[in-house]
Amino acid sequence: MEQTSMGKDSSKTAIAKFVPDDDGVLKHTIKVHQQPTSATEKKGPSMIARSNDLIEEIQIKRRFGEGTKPLFERDDVKVNTVADGESISSKKIKSHKASSPSKGVNGLVKQNSPDVTQKFTKKYGSSENPDFRRHSSYEKDNYHKSNSKSGVHLEGHEGNYRPYFSDPIRERDRLRRLYGSPNERRSRSHSPSSNRRRSSHRSRRGSGSPRSRRYTSRHRRRSNSQDRTSWKHNPEHRTSRRSRTRSPRGNRSRRRSSTSSNEDDEREYRHRHHRSQERSYQNVLPTLPPALTNYPCHYHVAPMLALPGVQHRPFLPMVASVRHLPPQALYGGLAGAMPFIPMPMTAYRPHLGHRYPPPRHKINKKN
């Protein structure tokens, strides 16, 4: 029996041939196709083949003073060693000592001397006691520096340190407020950035304030006619009195400002109303007294303007004391048209439409 295996991608194919002992013809041939499972397809770290030559070439390099030392050394991974003097922590200590040698070096030596430690431990107990930190100058300085409000520690920086953001105008105003004369302490100059913020805030607010809104609406109202009876019910006035925002926080101040603006508007309207009453007769068109017509006063005349197809004919005569003719004014010398008033009809006429016709059967009659 002979076995041959062929590998294609991830599947494996095995062919088994059965050869008889004597030189006969091959009778059976078996072909086995094996499909790998999904578990073998997952490539983990254990399936990555690493040769010895590849392991020797692995070397991880770090930048200057980057990272910390590994917990344990590995034979297959080499890391470049950094001297203790070149580490970042030692640099911080060195810069702190160089910036303040009296406090840094001498203070540390004096603070850690056995005489000082015995003196403090006798008086305030061990260093774990909070009184020890309160009365120790070095610990107190470190405690206040760590709990500062600004959170920016400039101890480790050199002398040529420049902040990331500097505003010379603000710095000048701050120095004037601190050390200047009383007149200079009230500085009204603003930096370009603050001016930009103020202008954007004004443009965003627009005419939302009640004062500016009052002036603009007043100007709009003056441009229109001054003799308006429905001034309060005007939609323009309603929109000017309505609040622009709906925030619940500013309701109190907005109500106060709106009431003051409404009072001013009412006062101005009253003043303007009296003024318009005085000038009300200046713009009235001149008219003449009522003129007499050519027709007798006890005849009611059909209007020619309303019904031009109807001829001019008199209706039933009426007594002048019962129904008076309305006065006619002459506009430019032309007589006005007479209004057509139909005569009242008291008789019931079935061919005409009535609002309440009489009932045709007796429903309210009592037996």
UniProtKB/Swiss-Prot annotation:
Disulfide bonds: none annotated. GO terms for biological process: cell differentiation; female sex determination; female sex differentiation. Residues 195-223, 239-257 have a biased composition (Basic residues). Keywords: Differentiation, Sexual differentiation. The keyword Acetylation does not apply. Residues 109-129 have a biased composition (Polar residues). The keyword Magnesium does not apply. Residues 86-280 are annotated as: Disordered. It comes from the Eukaryota. Residues 130-144, 229-238 have a biased composition (Basic and acidic residues). Sex differentiation protein controlling female somatic sexual differentiation. May act by promoting the formation of a splicing enhancer complex. This is Female-specific protein transformer. It comes from Musca domestica. The gene is tra.
